Each structure stands twice: as C-alpha cells, then as structure tokens.
C-alpha cells in the first residue's frame, strides 16, 4: 500500500509540473515580446530535447543507477533551470535567450516521462490492470495545476513558472523515497547499450514499427492542440485553465475504463479509435473557432480523454509488453523520443508555420507592436485576432492529416483474424459478465520474455527484435 501511494504521488506531481505551464505559457509569453515564430520554438525546444535525452537517460536507469534516483536528480536540476528561465523573463531577456533555457530544462524533463512509467511498471505485477490506476493520478495532477492557475490568477502571468519550480523541486526530493527500481547491472555494458540502441531492435517487429510510425505522425497534429487551443479558449472568453482541464477530467474517466476496453477492443481498435477522435476534435475546432461557438470548442476539449488514453496510454502499455525486461526503460525512452521528440518537433514547427500562414500580415505586424501593459488594447487585439485568422483552415489541416494517419494505421497494422477472434473470445468480448480487469491482461498476450519479441499477430522472433 505504501508503494502504491508513493507511485500515485509521483504521477500526480509528474504531470502537475507539466500542466502548470505548458498549455497556458503562450498567454504570458506573448506579453513579453514572443511572436508566433518564437512560440513555435518554445514548443519545439521540448521535442528537440526529447530526441536527445530519453534513450540515454533510459540506458542509465537500465544499466547504471536506480531509476527513481535518476528521476530525482533530473527533477531537482529541472526545478533549478525553470527558476533560471523565470529570472530571465523578469530581467527582460530576449525570446531566443529564454528559449535556450527552456530547451535545457526540457532535456531534464522529457526523460522523466519515460522514467516515471518505468518506476511504476517495474513495481507492479500486472501493468494492464494496475498501471491505469496509478497513471490516472497524473491526469489529476494536470487538473490540479489547471485549477491552481485559475484560482490563483496565474493563467496569464509569470507566476505559473514559479509554481512549476516548486512542484519540480518537490518531486525531486520525493523521488529518493520511491520504491527501489534498481538497474540491471549483471553484465558489462556494451557500446550499443551506452548509446541506448538496444531498444531500436523493437523496430524490427513490423507491427511495432507501424505503431511507432503512426505515433510519430499523430504527434504532428497533436502539437496544434498544445500550442494553439488555449488561445482559442481565451478568445471565446472562457476560463482558460479550467476549460482546458475538462479534457483531463474526461481522461480520468477513460483511463479507469482502459482495462474494460482492452478486453473488448484489443490493441489495434484502441489505437484506431484514439486517432479517429483526434481528427474529430480538430474538425470541431475548425467549425467552432471562427464563430466562437463555445459548445463546439468545449466539446473539442472534452474528447481529450479518448484521444490521449486510447492512443498514448495504450501505446505505453503495448511498449512495456513488447520490450524485454532489461531494456524497458530504454523502450519507454524510445517511445518518448520518437513521439514527443521527433513527432512533436515537426508538429511544433508546422503549427507555427500554419498559424503564421493563416494570420494576415496586417495583424502579424499589429501583434508585434502591442504594448500588453495597456489591458484594453491587449484584449482588443485578441478579439481582432479571432476575426482575422482563418481558423477553419488552421484547424482543418490537422483534422485531415489525423484522418490520413488513421487510414494508414488501420490498413498497415495487421492482426491475424483468427488470433483476433480467439482474443475476443478469451477476453470475454462476448461475455458481459467477464471481469474486465482480469481479462484485460489477456488482451495483449503473449507477454514478451527476455530476448524474445512477439508481433501482434502472435508470430515471434527469438533474436531480440
């Protein structure tokens, strides 16, 4: 019970840290001279860090140091870096200088997304059954951050970054009392292991390769949501952080339902539903944003639970089952690197470009000359932005792209029909009285043993790939 409570606290703070600034940052940064291109680089800094750091940090946790200690060091360092970034903002540093500090901070933060998963999964007996119960506290942490931002009136000012510092330092300290998650140090590390390349062997499995390619591609439109959606909410005159937190409330509900849906849908359908709802959400924004139709905007936020849980949480569990035990931290790091790293980097730059393309040049010039100390002028400029930006095109592009990714995945990700029907039978798909938490663990069988990787079809290679 003690371990469960500690792991829940870890997940709560892990996502409180992220939620405390990541969605609402543009609402403040635009007041200190950041334009659309600068914001694009702010959101590209994390993905670049995600490309560089997670595999290496995962390798350290796999081979040299207990994962919870690595997690603690990274958050303590990250808290200090976020404080330094905040000081840079206070002192009027340029957007480029601030973005450099953001980049270094994200080098410390992004690997902790995979490390927290590793610490949790290595201290549970059944990841399909137990992981959602712990991971849901991450969502609650994000929600708590959103409510704190609104209640403390931090949504559009620098205090959001101070709150992030405190949360990061707190988790850094708490990490050292988390359940011990020792490194696998039975053998001498090879150069391949030092470079964190062992996890790349997972890509030899065709089904996993298709999953990973689809994950990278779906993270391109994902960047639009994190980067732009909060400003649509603000311009619809809705409370920013609280409205954005509706997505996390739906995430809580669907997180707890994951074992139930695993038992009835299986991996492929779970992932496909997640991608399909991404396309639906952007279609809702494309229709609702131009006329400030609050119902459609809020509905687009509310479906976040399906978008995130059915694709990303399913993918984390799928990766945990595919990877041999000695490289599971690296495997989670690979997933973070290629999705929140490569995919989100491309998405951040594309979103910045598309936003600029859909913003008339006359407004772009006005935006750069706004003196945000004049509150009335600032609000007027926001309303002007809503009227002038081509929101239908801006959100229509990621909607079509997400739909195309769904088609690619559904066609390319092959399951053996015989195995699929057997799985439905075994998991109680036709038995409404079956225990979903018990049968969910069967939905991803067979579990990968060390040195063996199995495709979703049930075919196995015994060469580590």
Residue ranges and their predicted role:
Residues 12, 81, 93-115, 119, ...:
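Hydrophobic core of transmembrane alpha-helices in multi-pass small-molecule transporters
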Residues 1-50, 207-243, 312, 348:
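Helix-loop boundary and gating motifs at the non-cytosolic
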Residues 1, 178-213:
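Juxtamembrane intracellular "pre-TM" segments in multi-pass secondary transporters
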Residues 35-45, 129-139, 159-162, 234-252, ...:
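Loop-to-transmembrane helix entry
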Residues 73-92, 277-290:
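C-terminal ends and interior cores of transmembrane alpha-helices
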Residues 151-167, 353-402:
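A membrane-interface helix-boundary motif in multi-pass transporters
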Residues 85-89, 168-180, 341, 391, ...:
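Multi-pass alpha-helical transporter architecture, strongest
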Residues 52-66, 152-153, 254-267, 355:
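Helix-to-loop junctions at the C-terminal end of transmembrane segments
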């Amino acid at each position: 019970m003690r371990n469960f409570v500690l792991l829940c606290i870890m997940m709560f703070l892990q996502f409180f840290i992220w939620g405390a600034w990541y969605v609402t940052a543009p609402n403040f940064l635009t007041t200190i001279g950041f334009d659309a291109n600068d914001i694009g680089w702010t959101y590209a800094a994390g993905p670049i860090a995600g490309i560089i750091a997670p595999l290496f940090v995962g390798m350290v946790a796999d081979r040299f140091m207990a994962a919870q200690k690595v997690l603690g060091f990274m958050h303590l360092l990250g808290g200090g870096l976020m404080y330094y970034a905040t000081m840079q903002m206070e002192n009027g540093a340029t957007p480029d200088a601030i973005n450099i500090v953001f980049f270094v901070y994200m080098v410390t933060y992004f690997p902790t997304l995979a490390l927290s998963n590793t610490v949790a999964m290595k201290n549970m007996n059944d990841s399909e059954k137990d992981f959602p119960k712990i991971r849901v506290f991450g969502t609650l942490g994000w929600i708590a951050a959103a409510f704190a931002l609104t209640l403390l009136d931090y949504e559009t000012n620098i205090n959001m970054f101070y709150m992030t510092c405190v949360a990061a330092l707190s988790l850094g300290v708490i990490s050292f009392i988390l359940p011990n998650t020792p490194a696998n140090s039975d053998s001498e590390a090879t150069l391949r292991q030092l470079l964190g390349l062992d996890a790349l062997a997972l890509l030899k499995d065709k089904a996993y390769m298709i999953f990973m390619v689809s994950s990278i591609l779906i993270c391109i439109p994902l960047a639009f949501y994190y980067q732009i959606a909060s400003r649509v909410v603000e311009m619809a005159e809705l409370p920013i952080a609280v409205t954005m937190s509706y997505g996390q409330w739906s995430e809580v509900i669907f997180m707890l339902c994951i074992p139930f849906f695993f038992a009835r849908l299986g991996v492929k359908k779970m992932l496909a539903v997640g991608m399909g709802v991404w396309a639906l959400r952007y279609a809702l924004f494309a229709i609702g944003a131009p006329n400030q139709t609050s119902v459609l905007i809020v509905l687009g936020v509310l479906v976040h639970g399906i978008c995130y849980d059915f694709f990303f949480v399913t993918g984390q569990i799928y990766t945990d089952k595919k990877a041999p035990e000695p490289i599971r931290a690296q495997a989670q790091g690979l997933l973070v690197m290629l999705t929140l790293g490569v995919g989100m980097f491309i998405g951040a730059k594309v979103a910045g470009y598309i936003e600029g393309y859909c913003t008339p040049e006359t407004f772009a010039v006005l935006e750069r000359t706004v003196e945000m100390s004049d509150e009335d002028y600032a609000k007027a400029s926001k309303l002007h932005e809503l009227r002038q930006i081509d929101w239908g095109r801006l959100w229509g592009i990621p909607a079509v792209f997400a739909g195309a990714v769904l088609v690619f995945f559904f066609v390319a990700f092959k399951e053996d029909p015989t195995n699929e029907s057997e799985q439905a039978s075994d998991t109680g798909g036709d038995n409404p009285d079956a225990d979903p938490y018990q049968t969910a663990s069967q939905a991803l069988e067979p579990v990968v043993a060390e040195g063996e990787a199995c495709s979703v079809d049930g075919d196995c290679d015994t060469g580590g790939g």
